[in-house]
Amino acid sequence: MKSCQKMEGKPENESEPKHEEEPKPEEKPEEEEKLEEEAKAKGTFRERLIQSLQEFKEDIHNRHLSNEDMFREVDEIDEIRRVRNKLIVMRWKVNRNHPYPYLM
């Protein structure tokens, strides 16, 4: 009967400390700390992004470009595109004309 009483009562191993106890709040594993830091960073990034968007919406009405300024900006963008396309074509030609392309 003693064996039945032991089974009905507390387990024998309860007097021993558990090795797989959850860590105290002070002693969090490094992985949890990293996750919390990432969550905070994402939260702050999101807040900064929202703030930036609001500032842009407020500021957009104060930005008036004259026709000359608009043409100048468009010309700069076109020049950047032309140079970029030239570089892409030059790189393509160099890679295509290689005698042994698989040795690179």
UniProtKB/Swiss-Prot annotation:
It comes from the Eukaryota. Transmembrane segments: none annotated. Residues 1-44 are annotated as: Disordered. Residues 1-27 have a biased composition (Basic and acidic residues). It is found in: Nucleus. May be involved in transcriptional regulation. Belongs to the TFS-II family. TFA subfamily. This is Transcription elongation factor A protein-like 9. It comes from Homo sapiens. The gene is TCEAL9.
